[in-house]
């Protein structure tokens, strides 16, 4: 949110709470990408003594509760933006990415059980050339990256449509 607020200030020379509030959903999916990385590094970070949110849980699987809540909040926040009349109903276009979020979560559950597992290839996983030969770790980073990109693009579209 501070980044969005700062960019808004540089462009307009005014401060706006709207810019910060509108950035919260996008921030949640960005934090999801970062958190997924720490979940996949769970054992390494634990062995190296690195303190992360993920390794504060008893197991890698237990740490997925934070991921679940990040994803839930990412999809509830647009509803709140609509309820509080910050954005119009167009904001629900981000809900088209819910299947990607569910797929990502299931993929992380599989990773927790078997770090070498490769998720089933879906049309929205591109660009991931040679996906079946990509390491399991990178495949999930790409999944999370794609969710972040699609979600943010749909959110930007909703904001643009609300301005008209």
Regions found by a protein language model. Give the residues of each.
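Hydrophobic alpha-helical transmembrane segments
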Residues: 1-32, 65-164
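Solvent-exposed interhelical
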Residues: 27-72
């Amino acid at each position: 949110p501070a980044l969005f607020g700062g960019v808004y200030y540089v462009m307009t020379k005014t401060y706006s709470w709207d810019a910060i509030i509108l950035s919260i959903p996008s921030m949640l999916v960005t934090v999801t990408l970062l958190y997924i990385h720490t979940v996949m590094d769970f054992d390494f970070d634990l062995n190296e003594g690195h303190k992360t949110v993920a390794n504060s849980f008893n197991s890698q699987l237990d740490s997925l509760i934070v991921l679940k809540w990040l994803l839930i909040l990412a999809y509830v926040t647009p509803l709140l933006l609509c309820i509080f009349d910050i954005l119009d109903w167009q904001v629900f276009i981000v809900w088209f990415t819910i299947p990607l979020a569910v797929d990502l979560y299931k993929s992380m559950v599989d990773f927790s059980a078997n770090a070498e597992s490769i998720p089933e290839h879906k049309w929205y996983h591109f660009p991931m050339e040679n996906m079946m030969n990509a390491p399991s770790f990178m495949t999930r980073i790409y999944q999370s990256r794609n969710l972040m990109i699609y979600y943010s693009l749909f959110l930007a579209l909703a904001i643009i449509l609300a301005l008209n």
